[in-house]
């Protein structure tokens, strides 16, 4: 793997564009025989749409990865030429595409940037911050 790939969860939007959630579900199916309709999925605290301003270059990657019919749920263009991006909605769409039922998803509405006094936020703190964790469990 190259250095960019090894950064893991660091470049959050790249994980949504690459649909890591879908690949995880596929791997769970292949490896453990999991059925998507029985999988429970959760998205923990992360930056909210109001706090996640991105460039058109980032949005172009989302345009390539997601159906046009979903673009208005994922992002909108601001007067300054930048965009606001909804990673929570991106995760929801990825899980639905993977066969996970909507009622089996829990997507927090806790923004790391808005709550940086209690949560780490790259948007607030830059590289001088800790990390949140991600986990996967089989039952």
What is the predicted function of each stretch?
Residues 1, 11-139:
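Active-site microenvironment for binding and transforming phosphate-containing groups
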Residues 6-9:
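Glycine-rich phosphate/oxyanion-binding loops and their immediately adjacent helices
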């Amino acid at each position: 793997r190259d250095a960019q790939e090894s950064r893991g969860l660091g470049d959050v939007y790249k994980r949504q564009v690459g649909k890591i959630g879908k690949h995880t579900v596929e791997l769970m199916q292949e490896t453990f025989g999991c059925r998507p309709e029985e999988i429970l999925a959760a998205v923990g605290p992360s930056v909210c749409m109001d706090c996640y301003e991105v460039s058109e270059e980032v949005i172009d990657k989302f345009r390539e990865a997601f159906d046009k019919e979903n673009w208005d749920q994922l992002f909108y263009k601001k007067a300054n030429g930048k965009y606001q991006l909804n990673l929570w909605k991106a995760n929801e769409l990825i899980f639905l595409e993977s066969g996970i039922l909507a009622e089996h998803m829990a997507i927090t509405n806790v923004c790391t940037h808005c709550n940086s006094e209690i949560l780490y936020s790259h948007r607030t703190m830059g590289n001088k911050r800790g990390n949140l964790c991600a986990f996967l469990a089989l039952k």
